[in-house]
């Protein structure tokens, strides 16, 4: 049986016939079960990132492969599935294995899960899969465009952050979809996860396929691999030296920023924040010219700006900042050191027209 180790890639063993999706269930699915994940691809992650009796959760549980894998490893499991027909297929499949794992119908963005979450393990829905089932709000398979697909994906993982236990681990498996050109689904999902969690690592799962010839200068592949993106519900500690230097430099620019949040509490009393501040939170009054000066200066210092994980460039309209509650600036040095700054308007600022 495969074990999770330091290998950056491996080839999961195909499922034993006993664990495969039964033909009668496959036959009634809108996609004929072609997107059903393997139980064996999930089991090494279950063993490595959870302990017996803990709760394994799949927010896109589909046919219940993750839940079955968790049960086989002695874990508790529960899932969510937005398509009611697929949720029933998962329940039927699990019942045939005498697995008691609740499957809630709905989206995690709208509905709370059935139990706490120690490990989130999932295959995310593919973009552009030509869904033939019921089209419901939040059904990512039915997304009409890539931007709305990514927005929906972010909503689910943002909700996950509120439900996951501190230091809990998540694994999201995703393909780089091709349709004549690459759609960087794995990297875009990684960007979303990195904005919400600490993105730790990746593994590449490869699946054996028969070799096939390719005409000269053609590029098509059999797409026989997927990425497992590993993230954790924790925040990296703030680099205190970099934060102090940046704050000094901002103040030297004559910008009237106000420090708040965990860094302000730490400055006032380091013992009150024994784990250290999580990030550098700065407030700046709602004058567009001041915000433009600060954000343009930060860009010149090597900071990348983003709104809820979406890259942006200065100047950024204050109405947009208010709608997102904060503007993030992050710099990654060549030595790997990171500095993250969250810029906010004062909470008592009047609404902008």
Residue ranges of model-derived segments:
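Class I S-adenosyl-L-methionine-dependent methyltransferase catalytic core
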Residues: 1-237
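Short glycine-aromatic motifs
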Residues: 197, 257, 298-305
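Active-site beta-strand termini and strand-to-loop segments that position acidic
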Residues: 231-234, 285, 329-336
